[in-house]
Design a protein with these regions (language model features):
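Glycine/Thr-rich phosphate-binding loops of Rossmann-like dinucleotide-binding domains
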Residues: 59, 83-84, 132-133
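A short helix-loop-beta submotif of the ANL/AMP-binding
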Residues: 89-95
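N-terminal small-domain helix-loop-helix segment of the aminotransferase-like
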Residues: 1-54, 61
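Conserved PLP-anchoring active-site segment centered on the Schiff-base-forming lysine
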Residues: 65-87
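Short glycine-rich anion-binding loops that position phosphate/pyrophosphate groups of nucleotides
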Residues: 56, 80, 127-131
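Active-site phosphate-binding strand-loop segment of PLP-dependent enzymes
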Residues: 95, 100-174
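Short acidic capping loops at alpha-helix termini that bridge into adjacent secondary structure
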Residues: 44-49, 69-72, 119
Length: 176
């Protein structure tokens, strides 16, 4: 498309012809921080943002940084297939949070609570969910956040599909 060609030419004319900074271009990081601040109701600066080539790498880096051999990781199932493979690669034990069709693929907070052990370290939240399209309501987002706090769990929230929510309200654990 002509606008992409023009943007590429403009970037070259402006000297963007070398590797950028490892965390990403400052202007992009600041714009992402503004977007997150506005959509989640939290204060984020460009210094809090790292740009990666897609969501998978940063989720993978997070798993590698936080999950040790034998740590349990709660993740939505059905869900993005890469969650389970990343947990396994990091040496963790995948613990599926079952999203059943009989519950419209919504999470059962009491069931999640029963799955938490002393080895549970991380909880993955994905809403809207891939591939089901289900969302976690505000009450359950709060309850999951409270569980994470009570059991000292880190939460990896995958909000990538929030722009594909066509009815209802988007709720993210980062807003709490």
């Amino acid at each position: 498309p002509s606008n992409i060609i023009a943007a590429g030419n403009r970037a070259m004319d402006e000297g963007y012809t070398h590797y950028g900074p490892s965390p990403g271009l400052t202007e992009l990081r600041e714009r992402i921080a503004l977007e997150v601040s506005e959509t989640r109701g939290i204060s984020v600066t460009g210094d809090n943002v790292v740009v990666t080539p897609g969501a998978k790498p940063i989720m993978f880096f997070t798993m590698l940084a936080l999950v040790d051999e034998g740590d349990e990781v709660l993740y939505p199932n059905p869900g993005f297939p890469i969650y389970e493979s990343m947990i396994n690669f990091a040496g963790g034990i995948p613990v599926p949070m079952k999203l059943l069709s009989s519950r419209n693929f919504s999470v059962n907070v009491d069931e999640v609570r029963s799955q938490i052990t002393s080895k549970t370290k991380l909880m993955v939240i994905n809403s809207p969910n891939n591939p089901c399209g289900s969302t976690i309501n505000h009450k359950d987002i709060i309850a999951l956040a409270e569980l994470a706090k009570e059991y000292d769990l880190t939460v990896l929230t995958d909000d990538i599909y929030r722009r594909f929510l066509y009815e209802g309200d988007f709720h993210s654990v980062t807003s709490l």
